[in-house]
């Protein structure tokens, strides 16, 4: 997400920007950039709260202190169980019929005539209603999502159902391979702005939405804070190590 000092985000009047981050899994070993981004934005003065579709990838006792602290303050969408979730969804629909109807229309529009896709869309709708209610209770007024897959589908339905502005960080490559299955054009066009992790990612976004204006598109690369690393002592016969993924 852009640095708030030069972000395309804007709110009417003097309303304070309070951001919800919707992530697929938080914390997670392979998603350390989520943690660094959230902490970095908070250090810059942005009020950021996190919701995660799934629970952490490790037990709490196995989490580093900073990740355990984040987990304690993260809203986990699937944490209630089926029965309690069903009751909560019925309450949301009863108390906010307009929200439920807008969300249902958005979900069914995405599913088209594919029965399986519609079924998945209804699951995404359920999660979107829960996320929107959490945002309302926390007085959060902007939703940001990482990854362009199912979690972004939940984010888009949340925005449409609850009338909340939203944005997305796209990584690729999956969503670029099957744009229709990921509803990529709809996500790009409905988002307030789109963040790309590389110039190549940006070029793919512009292929999908060539009329997207520059003010709604930013490149923010994922990197490593070299200041946090200690160089190893030099060896006369160093070993070479090939890594598949850096986390």
What are these regions (language model features)?
Residues 19-20, 141-175, 195:
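Active-site proximal beta-strand in glycosyltransferases
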């Amino acid at each position: 997400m852009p640095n708030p000092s030069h972000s395309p985000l804007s709110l009417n009047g003097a309303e304070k920007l309070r951001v919800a981050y919707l992530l697929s899994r938080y914390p997670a070993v392979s998603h350390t950039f989520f943690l660094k981004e959230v902490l970095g934005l908070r250090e810059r003065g942005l009020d950021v709260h996190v919701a995660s579709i799934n629970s952490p990838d490790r037990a709490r006792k196995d989490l580093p202190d900073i990740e355990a602290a984040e987990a304690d303050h993260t809203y986990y969408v699937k944490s209630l169980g089926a029965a309690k979730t069903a009751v909560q969804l019925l309450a949301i629909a009863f108390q906010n019929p307009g929200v439920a109807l807008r969300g249902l229309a958005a979900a069914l529009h995405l599913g088209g005539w594919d029965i399986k896709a519609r079924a998945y869309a209804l699951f995404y709708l359920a999660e979107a209603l829960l996320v929107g209610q959490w945002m309302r209770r926390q007085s959060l007024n902007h939703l940001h999502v990482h990854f362009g897959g199912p979690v972004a589908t939940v984010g888009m339905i949340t925005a449409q159902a609850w009338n909340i502005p939203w944005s997305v960080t796209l990584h690729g490559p999956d969503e670029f391979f099957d744009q229709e299955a990921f509803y990529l054009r709809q996500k790009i066009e409905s988002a307030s702005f789109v963040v790309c992790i590389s110039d190549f990612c940006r070029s793919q976004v512009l292929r999908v939405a060539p009329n997207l204006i520059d003010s709604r598109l930013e490149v923010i690369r994922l990197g490593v804070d070299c200041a946090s690393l200690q160089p190893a002592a030099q060896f006369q016969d160093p070993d070479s190590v090939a890594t598949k993924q850096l986390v």
